[in-house]
A protein has these predicted regions:
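Flexible glycine/proline-rich, aromatic-decorated loop/lid segments
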Residues: 30, 71-77, 114-127, 135-167, ...
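Structured ligand/cofactor/substrate-binding pocket environments in proteins
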Residues: 8-13, 52-59, 89-107, 139-148, ...
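Short beta-alpha connecting loops at secondary-structure transitions
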Residues: 1-7, 44-47, 84-92, 126-138, ...
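Flexible, glycine-rich loop/tail regions that form catalytic "lids" or insertion modules at the edges
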Residues: 181-184, 188-357
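Structured core elements
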Residues: 34-36, 82-85, 122-126, 140-141, ...
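Catalytic alpha/beta active-site cores
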Residues: 1-87, 92-93, 111, 118-124, ...
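Catalytic or ion-translocation cores adjacent to nucleophile or general acid/base/metal-coordination motifs
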Residues: 25, 167-170, 356-357
């Protein structure tokens, strides 16, 4: 959705998601999430925090509808759900966790009769990659610190802090250590966070929570009028919304309407944007020999497993035709089949994604 990387026909893709959920429930798989419902890539592609929350939650609710329609017990498959959001600098990011948890808990309790555990929304926060800038790039650590503070004050279950040089390249060991130090200092030294829920009762936090929740629900209504998440996907609602909001952000950044210190305000006329070329960073690339080695290894694997692979692919196609659990079959055949072979078989039996124009 955000990365524009839909591959399979939607029906096929959702059927496979249901197959995975069914496999986990039937085999009582615990302590492992079969899906991390992600809003991070939606945010990075340009969406604002409200749209990030709305599209992510609506995806999760769609999964619940589909899995329940297959007869799966929500209390059993929801224990293997996790969530993933981005935190930027806007004030709404301070409450996307509590808003998402409130909407999710009410929906699970009142609409689906789910127990207490399934009402809980376990989420990971990563600081915003697109908020990092190559101008005055050392200041990115300050932005990341504030974003991490948002996450911890909003009771995120886990946190990833980006390195300051990710604005222009792969981070170095030193910048990664500094990014980890941000978390450690906030967790171990910053006294305010010793309070379990420091924003509780705050006027601005409560106001933002109610405001963001209302706007998320409005987006739900817009998608509902288009036939739900799947109907909205067919008419590019989500993708268009993400692109429009990304364009607005870039426009405001360039006009200075959205101030970014060191980039469009309080700039140093003698300071220039930096790139990876300005640093002694060893970039690892595959040379021709390594590429040929991987290709040869792949061909050798396919040759050695040709007969079993053919049988496995045929079994997968037959399972697809009969509507059986594809994930269960894939767990058997991946020892003898490549990802490419399995993907091609799924294309042939289920079709590719075709975007409406």
């Amino acid at each position: 959705m955000g990365q524009n990387t839909l591959v399979f026909n939607l029906d096929t893709a959702l059927k496979m998601m249901g197959d995975v959920a069914e496999f986990y429930v039937d085999n009582d798989v615990r302590n492992h999430y079969f899906v991390s419902i992600s809003g991070y890539h939606i945010d990075e592609a340009g969406a604002n925090p409200i749209t990030q929350s709305a599209l992510t939650l609506s995806n999760g609710l769609t999964y619940v509808e589909l899995f329940k329609a297959r007869g799966l017990d929500a209390d059993k498959f929801l224990r293997n759900f996790s969530w993933f959001f981005s935190n930027g600098m806007d004030p709404e990011y301070a409450v996307i966790g509590r808003v998402s948890r409130r909407i999710w808990a009410i929906a699970m309790r009142d609409l689906y009769g789910v127990g207490e555990r399934g009402q809980k929304l376990k989420y990971h926060i990563q600081s915003s990659g697109r908020s990092l800038h190559s101008q005055e790039f050392t200041w990115n650590d300050y932005r990341t610190t504030l974003q991490a503070l948002y996450a911890l004050a909003d009771n995120a279950n886990s946190l990833h802090t980006n390195s300051r040089d990710e604005a222009f390249g792969t981070p170095t060991e030193d910048t990664v250590r500094d990014a980890v130090a941000i978390q450690l200092i906030l967790a171990k030294e910053y006294g305010w966070l010793r309070n379990e829920n420091p924003l509780q009762g705050s006027f601005i936090a409560e106001f933002l929570t109610n405001e963001v929740e209302e706007r998320v629900l409005r987006i739900f209504e817009e998608m509902h009028s288009r036939g739900g998440v799947l109907g909205a996907l067919e008419v590019n609602y989500q993708r268009n919304r993400i692109q429009d909001e990304g364009m607005i952000y870039e426009h405001r950044k360039h006009t200075g309407e959205t101030p970014i210190v060191g980039v469009n305000t309080f700039t140093d006329p003698e300071s220039e944007s930096v790139s990876a070329d300005d640093f002694d960073i060893e970039v690892t690339r595959s040379d021709v020999t390594e590429k040929k080695m991987v290709i040869a290894r792949n061909e050798k694997f396919k040759t050695e497993n040709a007969k079993k692979a053919e049988e496995g692919i045929q079994k997968l196609k037959e399972a697809a035709r009969r509507g059986e659990n594809l994930f269960e079959v894939m767990m058997e055949i991946v020892e003898h089949c490549t990802v490419g072979q399995v993907t091609q078989a799924l294309f042939e039996s289920g079709g590719k994604f075709r975007r409406n124009m």
